[in-house]
């Protein structure tokens, strides 16, 4: 029996989220750089926090449950997560991106990406014909924000996933603006889901973080290698802050939808407002 999303926000897919062996109800912050070994060549599974940390791992397990992913890697910011995903590509590879993207992503692909030989086209991904128009043999992926930041443009993820599968492309989706509470891109065919956790996931404006949720084992292994090698990992304390924030994700999203509906209804009654 699968857990409801409210339960996953607190426990992930576990029966409980107590720390072993302490049984701490609030998962501890393992604020350490290194971990001792039981004996020579006998690791506990944790060696160095850049590679793996219990607090961060617990948070990653919660995101994996929320997004229905194979695995999740936590990063020090949303842009660190995006950068790790673009590190999957080689010079000469081509990526098709939504024309309306978060400015940091646009800057990344137009500067560092271009310097490293990445080719990018920005199109209206809500129009499949526009995507097909720029397809080329070097195309490796679709990169989609829906709703997009900042113009809230919408893309049909299922339709794009079918197109991506037809052309053997990676389907990458930024799910920051809807969160797992309202949308699960992997269930709609995405291979990779990205989050900037400083928005709805954390919800308290007190930290920044990013996630890459991978649908398949091979992709997950590549992302973890990039994270371990480049070092953009999320700290134990920030992992705990995001974990705390996610506990209230469901109730916050419900109230935010209610508030948005109230504002929209009020605006429709204003004579000076033409369209809502």
Spell out what each predicted region is.
Residues 274-276:
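Short beta-strand elements
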Residues 17-18, 72-272:
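Conserved PLP-enzyme active-site core in the AAT-like
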Residues 34-83, 87-88, 104-111:
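Conserved N-terminal alpha-helix of the aminotransferase class I/II PLP-enzyme fold
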Residues 24-25, 57, 68, 206:
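Short, basic and Ser/Thr-rich N-terminal targeting/leader segments
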Residues 1-53, 59-62:
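N-terminal "arm"/small-domain region of PLP-dependent enzymes with the aminotransferase-like
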